[in-house]
Amino acid sequence: MRWAILPIAASLAFAADPADLVREAASGWTQAAVKQDAAGLERFLADDLQYAHAGGQTQNKREYIAAVTKGPARYESFTFSDQKVVLYGKAAVLTAFCDVKMVGRESFRVRTLQVYVENNGQWQMAAHQSTRVGR
C-alpha cells in the first residue's frame, strides 16, 4: 500500500503552480501577438475577451485578433517587470509594468492589469486594461 501512494505523491509534488501557468499564458499571448499568430491568440484569449488599450480603445476577441494579425501596427516585443499574480480559484489577476516595442514606432511603458480564467485546464486572458506610464 505504501508503494502505491508514492507515484501519486510524486506527481503532486511536480504539479505546476497555477500562478506559473498564468505567467506562461501571458507569455504565450505576447509571443503570439509578436508573431501575428492567429491560432496562438485563439488559444490564449478567452472567447468573451474584453481588451482595453492604453488609449481607451476597446476590442473583443475577434476584433483584437484581426487588428494584431492584419492591422498596420506590429508588435516587436513585450518586456514585463514587477509582475504579480493573485489567484482566485479558477480566475487570476496579473499586474505588471510592460515595456511595449512596436515596429517603426517609439516604445512605451504601460501598467497593465489582466484577468485570466481557467478553461478546461488552459489559462486564458479574459480582460485586459493598460495605462501609459513614464519610465
Put a short name on every predicted segment:
Residues W3-A13:
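Sec-dependent N-terminal signal peptides
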